[in-house]
Amino acid sequence: MINWDDPLAPISQPAEALHPAANPVLDENQGQATAAQAAPNIDVRPVNPDDKRVINGMTDINQLAPFKYPWAWEYFLNANRNHWTPLDINMAQDVHDYGHSLTLEERHVYENVLSYLTTSDILAMRNIGLAVMEKMSAPELQIYQARQVYEESLHTWTYQHCIETLGLDQGEIYNRYRVVPEINGKIQIANRRLDSVLRADIDLSNRDELHNFLMAYIFFAGIFEGCWFYNGFSPIFALQRRGLMKGTAEQFLHHA
């Protein structure tokens, strides 16, 4: 404990001051020479867009333009022009329809759709953000993929908004993919594909690894998104054609 009445003691010198040879001071010329020797041989030329690659590219990932893939930048701009949120759509009629117009079987189907889509869009978001985007070696592709991650999270918000608006049991709905065999089977297939490309030691310069990555990409784009998602949308659009759950259907139309 410090006692402020104690007499001042002499200050001891630091070890480096006692042994100057162990901590030499370089003069200005010596410092410049040492820095020049340590500096790597850096190519400071601007990026040539022809050298960019979708994956396994060696160009500077921090230089956005000039573009090699201008369509990706256009997709990014168009996606930002088409901004919306689930709160933009009136769900009042859906609350009435769910409580008074849907049969027990129709409610069951509606809930199963939400259960499958909530889990699936989280998987889609993780696939793009964790498995695909970080492997893209052209920045315009990464930027568009980043927007896609946001879109998938927006879709998940949509389903959550429907669940909250209708007052459904969130724990039961979100856990249903573990209980319903048909839903669980699809999720397990997607999980296996995703896990195979999330490994820390994946090497896309290896032909077999690259083939597996492409197969996972095709699966998520063509089957998971292209087929299974639309199978999930179709029961909601069938209800819409009968004048039911039109708010939910309008939400889903923003995804398509």
At which residue positions do the language-model features occur?
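Short, isolated positions within intrinsically disordered regulatory regions of eukaryotic proteins
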Residues: L8, Y75-L77, D88, H161, ...
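Non-heme di-metal
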Residues: Q93-A256
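N-terminal intrinsically disordered, low-complexity tails
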Residues: M1, D5-A36
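Generic surface-pattern signal
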Residues: Q13, Q63, N78-T85, E164, ...
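Short acidic (Asp/Glu) and glycine-rich catalytic loops that position anionic groups and cofactors
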Residues: A36, D51-I55, G243-G247
